[in-house]
């Protein structure tokens, strides 16, 4: 019973960390990265479709993304979707290939992005702590129902705290990496 609670908590914490990493990878740095455009949705035959399902996105060099659209007639819609996004990008089309040059980030914009990333990291920490609280509540309920001893309860809560510390450390490491990436010139 206790092992199931710990396993569930660990899986949920792992998902929280992965969600955070995915979230902060979408934040634009000065370097070209294909996952920068992951959140962009294109109108494809009247249905909103993720960009990566209608085109291939690759980093051409450090400051340019190249988008190869599978259906040439879709190129204008892809350009429009990129311009409508809040990424501040201006794509240029050359047939089926759309090039997206990434302008260098200003110091002020970098600091704003760091604030956003730190806020995302704090949300990740809060979700980890909420998972810890849920697991501890379940363990306390087992103690209350006399299914486990007080020693088992304490031992389990200590193990869950160690899990919590480990996952919060992973969040802090991801944050540190992203901050360093943002401050590179």
UniProtKB/Swiss-Prot annotation:
GO BP term (any one): cytoplasmic translational termination
Subcellular location field: Cytoplasm
Keyword Amino-acid biosynthesis (UniProt): no
Keywords assigned by UniProt, alphabetized: Cytoplasm, Protein biosynthesis
Broad class of the protein's primary localization: cytoplasm
Entry GO MF terms: ribosomal large subunit binding
Family annotation (Pfam families): RRF
InterPro entries with a match to the protein in the record: Ribosome_recyc_fac (IPR002661), Ribosome_recyc_fac_dom (IPR023584), RRF_sf (IPR036191)
Any one GO cellular component localisation term in the record: cytosol
NCBIfam families xref list: frr
Family membership noted in the UniProt record: Belongs to the RRF family.
Known function: Responsible for the release of ribosomes from messenger RNA at the termination of protein biosynthesis. May increase the efficiency of translation by recycling ribosomes from one round of translation to another.
Name of this protein: Ribosome-recycling factor
Gene source species: Proteus mirabilis (strain HI4320)
């Amino acid at each position: 019973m206790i092992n199931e609670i710990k396993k569930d908590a660990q899986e949920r914490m792992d998902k929280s960390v992965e969600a955070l990493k995915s979230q902060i990878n979408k934040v634009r740095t000065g370097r070209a990265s294909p996952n920068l455009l992951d959140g962009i949705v294109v109108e494809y035959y009247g249905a909103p479709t993720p960009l990566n399902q209608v085109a291939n996105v690759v980093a051409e060099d450090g400051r340019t993304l190249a988008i190869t659209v599978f259906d040439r007639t879709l190129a204008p819609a892809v350009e429009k979707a990129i311009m409508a996004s809040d990424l501040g990008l201006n794509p240029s089309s050359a047939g089926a290939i759309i090039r997206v040059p990434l302008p260098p980030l200003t110091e002020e914009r970098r600091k704003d992005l760091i604030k956003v990333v730190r806020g995302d990291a704090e949300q990740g920490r809060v979700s980890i702590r909420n998972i810890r609280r849920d697991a501890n509540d379940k363990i306390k309920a087992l103690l209350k129902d006399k299914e486990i001893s007080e020693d088992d309860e304490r031992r389990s809560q200590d193990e869950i705290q160690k899990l919590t510390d480990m996952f919060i450390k992973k969040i802090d490491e991801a944050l540190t990496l992203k901050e360093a990436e943002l401050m590179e010139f």
